[in-house]
Regions:
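Charged interaction segments
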Residues: 21-106
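Short, extreme N-terminal segment that most often corresponds to the first beta-strand
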Residues: 1-26
Length: 106
């Protein structure tokens, strides 16, 4: 059985409709812990997942908005198993920042 992970996300964008739709998709697909408010094109929210960062689900959500000014950062953690991940969506693609960082140091 996979453990429950906490995800803290920051979603920003200049197109308010796209921003609202991405946030709606996240809240529809995952259990959100906090009240969701958009302020000046930015929203911070917290949600849970069964297991690590839900890359496939997030890619499916963001694939709908190619070429849009959309920036998403997600920190995923589950402390009992020492899991920490940092993913960024920028310029139409997702990157795993910690994986990149530690591959460069090896």
């Amino acid at each position: 059985m996979e453990n429950i992970c906490t995800n803290i996300a920051v979603v920003t964008g200049t197109d308010k409709q796209v921003l609202e739709q991405v946030i709606k998709d996240i809240s529809k697909n995952f259990e959100c812990y906090t009240d969701i408010e958009i302020d000046n094109g930015c929203c911070e929210l917290e949600f849970s997942t069964n297991g690590p960062f839900p890359r496939e689900a997030m890619e499916a959500m963001t694939k709908k908005y190619p070429g849009k000014d959309l920036y998403i950062q997600v920190i995923t953690y589950e402390l009992p198993n020492e899991l920490v991940q940092h993913h960024i969506y920028e310029n139409g693609k997702w990157t795993d920042k910690l994986k990149e960082k530690y591959q460069q140091n090896n």
